[in-house]
Amino acid sequence: MDKHEKQKIKKICVIGLGYIGLPTASMLANHGYEVIGVDISEKRVNEIKNGDFKIEEPGLLTLLKGAINSKNLNVKTKAEKADAFIICVPTPAIGCDDGSKKCDLSYVLDAVNSILPYIDEGNLIVIESTIPPETTQKIYDIIDKKVYVAHCPERVLPGKILKELVENDRIIGGINKKSAEMAKEIYKSFVEGKIYITDSNTAEMVKLMENTYRDINIALANEFAKICDEIGVNVWDAIKIANKHPRVNILNPGPGVGGHCISIDPWFIVEKTNNAKFIRSARELNDKMPYYVCNMIISELKNLNIEKPKVTVFGATYKGNVEDTRESPSKKVIDALAEKNIPVSTYDPHANSFEYELHSLEDSIVNSDCIVVLTDHNEFKSFKKEEIDEISKKLKNKLIIDTKNILNHNLWKKAGFKIKLLGNGAW
């Protein structure tokens, strides 16, 4: 393999052109690499070519156009020979009989199998998809050729992907040192943060630890919220003051945890060991929050003696100011309300698609009895008095349940609204 070790990587094939693959392919192309972007969806490939993709990410369209115009990026439905292959496909969680979940590696394995005919001795294969420990080594064994394999997990936040692709530190774990060093040569072309080299098992575990830490912290905040509801304390005030301590950093509670990372990744640790009971408990607590919110809604409607209520949900995406609805707590809240035969209209200024019908603001609130805020979009934070007055006219009852603590409560109260805040037992 000596002759290949001296070969400079010039051509890269990126498999999967979603939230991570498309920005990564575009970034590499803009930094001089010949990039083949591959997605099995012909519809998606055509959308990308036309700049008509459904990813709401600042700067991405400009970056993509620059990559395509430079002739360094070509998007296709099939891979071809290259010096390096980067796999950026989803790794969702699938349910198990015991109520837990585990990683669905089918997309990763399909991606690996799709590039097998094009892999030559000395090529580099990088897995960016989040995977359980020991998976990178298994992929190397599947390839069964003298190649280099590394894991470089993505660590970006939707809405800030391009900024964080460049500025964030990266971790690269190889099946051997040479694999990690080869991958580092690629990423240092655009990464301004530090790049840490380790083995593949450690890199896999680091990514899972990062998101598990946040999931557990949110679970703690959610448990505090439930306790504060019970004992008459405002959890938001309590957390704010507790965080004044220099060694305390409690995150905010909310209606649950969604997205393709934090709500999924802890299960990849749980599936590997029986010693992850605390991690599993936190994950299950967060998964139950949408049902806690549903019970809050029903309780407040009963307190107002509202028969046959209609509910309006503000926010379908899993977090604020993105269009991504994957694993959104909003869906679970609406599911739970539907089981109680409570009709729901959903308004979201960012979501492009959702399991339930999306309505305009005006249509969603007509004759509604309750507005439930489930996502912290800027549009919800910045309602002006005139807009609130117009909303008020269309409602049947003026009840708001704010699970994100983002509304200007004084403005809404002046318009006659009753506001119930998640975790505020003091109201």
From Swiss-Prot:
InterPro entries: 6-PGluconate_DH-like_C_sf (IPR008927), NAD(P)-bd_dom_sf (IPR036291), UDP-Glc/GDP-Man (IPR017476), UDP-Glc/GDP-Man_DH_C (IPR014027), UDP-Glc/GDP-Man_DH_C_sf (IPR036220), UDP-Glc/GDP-Man_DH_dimer (IPR014026), UDP-Glc/GDP-Man_DH_N (IPR001732), UDP_ManNAc/GlcNAc_DH (IPR028359)
Reactions listed under catalytic activity: UDP-N-acetyl-alpha-D-mannosamine + 2 NAD(+) + H2O = UDP-N-acetyl-alpha-D-mannosaminouronate + 2 NADH + 3 H(+)
Listed Pfam families: UDPG_MGDP_dh, UDPG_MGDP_dh_C, UDPG_MGDP_dh_N
GO molecular function: NAD binding; oxidoreductase activity, acting on the CH-CH group of donors, NAD or NADP as acceptor; UDP-N-acetyl-D-mannosamine dehydrogenase activity
Keywords in alphabetical order: NAD, Oxidoreductase
SMART domains: UDPG_MGDP_dh_C
Enzyme class: oxidoreductase
Sites where the protein binds NAD(+): Y19, I20, D39, R44, T91, T130, R326
An example Gene Ontology biological process: polysaccharide biosynthetic process
Residues forming the catalytic site: K207 (proton donor/acceptor), C261 (nucleophile)
This enzyme's EC code(s): 1.1.1.336
Residues that bind UDP-N-acetyl-alpha-D-mannosaminouronate: R155, V156, K207, N211, R214, H245, R247, G258, Y318, K319, K404
PANTHER family: UDP-N-ACETYL-D-MANNOSAMINE DEHYDROGENASE (PTHR43491:SF2)
NCBIfam families named in the record: NDP-sugDHase (TIGR03026)
Function as written in the Swiss-Prot or TrEMBL entry: Catalyzes the four-electron oxidation of UDP-N-acetyl-D-mannosamine (UDP-ManNAc), reducing NAD(+) and releasing UDP-N-acetylmannosaminuronic acid (UDP-ManNAcA).
Quaternary context: Homotetramer; probably dimer of dimers.
Family membership noted in the UniProt record: Belongs to the UDP-glucose/GDP-mannose dehydrogenase family.
Protein name as catalogued: UDP-N-acetyl-D-mannosamine dehydrogenase
Species of origin: Methanococcus vannielii (strain ATCC 35089 / DSM 1224 / JCM 13029 / OCM 148 / SB)
Gene name, Swiss-Prot/TrEMBL: wecC
